[in-house]
Amino acid sequence: DLPEIQINFTPMVVKEEGKRATFSIQNFLNLGKAVIARGKSAIPGVQLDINLQQPKSVGSIKLSSSNPFDKPIIDPNYLSDQRDIEDFTKAFRHLRYITEQDAFKDVLNTEISPGSNIKTDDDIHSAIRNLTTTGHHPVSTCRMGNDNDKSAVLDNKFIVRGTKNLRVVDASAFPDQINGNINAAVIMMGEKAADIILDIPPLKREDPRETTI
């Protein structure tokens, strides 16, 4: 089976305001600068983030008008599928189990968020709904698929159906979510699309058992 969750460990706590974490790359870099300047964390602690690798909830992007310069209507539709809530809950409990091990006793003290008082499934579900945000790896908004797939925007050459030379080559072309971060897969897709556009034939398949180094 493929992994269902990814856990990110960050050696500092990103400050929160209200219910939503105020994480941004700039905030993270500022905290990093503070660590270097002061020789210690600006906000001492460790942050552990849970990422679902195969979320079941599906969002959408729709045109707001016929004007291509108007902003689209984006609905991430987070946690609309109850299975995501259940997967997050299992991951949350497992993460607590990890932090309770002897190896962490000398370095971890108080659970800042959502707090050690959050114990029941209902409380955990509420915390998940309040704290969940993007993992910055959205995919499949212009997905590739066969001619019989009405949800497929692109054909197998990355061309937008109904056009001749308009292609989309990025994570939105993924037919489905992959397990893990998308950077390497997007680079691979770009290389493949370049070969298709330049009409470069695929590499010959080789038997690794016959490859010499």
Regions found by a protein language model. Name each.
Residues 1-185, 193-213:
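FAD-dependent oxidoreductase catalytic-site/capping-region signature
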